[in-house]
Amino acid sequence: MKIILATSNKDKVKEIKAFYKNYEIYALNEIMQPFEIKETGSSFKENALIKVNAVYKKLEEMKLENEFMALSDDSGICVDILGGAPGIYSARYSNDMVIHPTDESNRAKLISKLHKKNVKTSPAHYTACIALSCKSGNFTTHGFMHGRVIDEERGNNGFGYDFMFIANGFSKTIGELDENTKLKISHRSKGLFLMSKILKILNRSF
């Protein structure tokens, strides 16, 4: 089974490939020219479906829908003391500060927001919605990772807000954990695991 991801983000591609070793996984730019997808949804699920449907439509235009399934991920971090922000805007949280938001600028803004609340830490959780589009229709799953954010960056293994997030039951940030541990506890892995159950069923008729 071949799966095209609705992303060319090397970190996400690496994580998904590590989880789905039994499938042929391709980044978006390996199959088609990357194109802009406007994430206009109001939830992780809506945005994940917007992305995966846009990619699957391109597959149909390329007459590849019988060869590929499309998979997308929309994820982010929700911080309690900030009312759930940055949430679905996690990847572009600092777009009011810089023209092109980066992981670094997003983390800097989150730390600044914590300091404005006069706190160094807050309960938080990651959410990931995994969406699949294929001949059989659309399917979605969710994964969560609960813990807390801190106002400093620690570690060098990860991306996004990993360096300032500590999962429940751990004393190290996600950025300080090894890959195997991350794969076991991450929100994305949990969502991918649930999606793997759906993929196994679909694989029988694909």
Swiss-Prot record:
Amino acids binding Mg(2+): D74
Necessary cofactors: Mg(2+)
GO cellular component, one term: cytosol
Binding site for substrate: T7, S8, N9, K10, D11, K12, S75, F159, G160, Y161, D162, K182, H187, R188
CDD domains assigned: HAM1 (cd00515)
Annotated keywords: Hydrolase, Magnesium, Metal-binding, Nucleotide metabolism, Nucleotide-binding
Entry function: Pyrophosphatase that catalyzes the hydrolysis of nucleoside triphosphates to their monophosphate derivatives, with a high preference for the non-canonical purine nucleotides XTP (xanthosine triphosphate), dITP (deoxyinosine triphosphate) and ITP. Seems to function as a house-cleaning enzyme that removes non-canonical purine nucleotides from the nucleotide pool, thus preventing their incorporation into DNA/RNA and avoiding chromosomal lesions.
Oligomeric and partner information: Homodimer.
PANTHER family for the chain: INOSINE TRIPHOSPHATE PYROPHOSPHATASE, INOSINE TRIPHOSPHATE PYROPHOSPHATASE/HAM1 PROTEIN
Name by which UniProt lists this protein: dITP/XTP pyrophosphatase
Organism for this UniProt entry: Campylobacter hominis (strain ATCC BAA-381 / DSM 21671 / CCUG 45161 / LMG 19568 / NCTC 13146 / CH001A)
